[in-house]
């Protein structure tokens, strides 16, 4: 018997941004879906606009599971995770243990299919970078949504993430920012007017 999917089902119970006041809370499961959709889009943009031949499904699969180990660790807030180099190094060890525990739940005959999805060191670096970009984009979108709802709690995070995205070397990220992100500052009536 494997407890893998019983654990994965608990992704919806792990709240993100735990130290911040949220107008609307976000859980790891819904965040992972959004990251998967954005990672898929980044690959499509990259292939169609910038001549790459990447596999959108590989990026999507990696994105779905990118935070799965948080079922075991919880979502440690960024200021805590990166407080200093010692804490960051120790947390990476904790993450590695949690990733291995996730893989250990997979039946032996499927372990190789899941290894690169659960163990970040086994993930293809190209797709890992795409998922990291998508993850950053989604965190930025969360900040925009909170700001639009009048919550200034996310201002500092928004500025930090915006700077990260502006310095991102992937041209698909800039394209996504220019094409899709502005809509996140609009309300539903404004979005519907544009249809």
Curated annotation (Swiss-Prot):
The record marks 16 as: Appears to be important in orienting the phosphate for catalysis. Its cofactor is a divalent metal cation. The keyword Ribosomal protein does not apply. This is 5'-deoxynucleotidase SO_2484. Catalyzes the strictly specific dephosphorylation of 2'-deoxyribonucleoside 5'-monophosphates. Its main location: cytoplasm. Substrate binds at residues 16-17, 31, 67, 75-78, 135. Residues 28-140 form the HD domain. Keywords: Cytoplasm, Hydrolase, Metal-binding, Nucleotide-binding. SUPFAM superfamilies: HD-domain/PDEase-like. It is found in: Cytoplasm. A divalent metal cation binds at residues 31, 66-67, 135. One of its GO terms (molecular function) is metal ion binding. It catalyses: a 2'-deoxyribonucleoside 5'-phosphate + H2O = a 2'-deoxyribonucleoside + phosphate. GO terms for cellular component: cytoplasm. Homodimer. Its EC number is 3.1.3.89. Belongs to the 5DNU family. The keyword Signal does not apply.
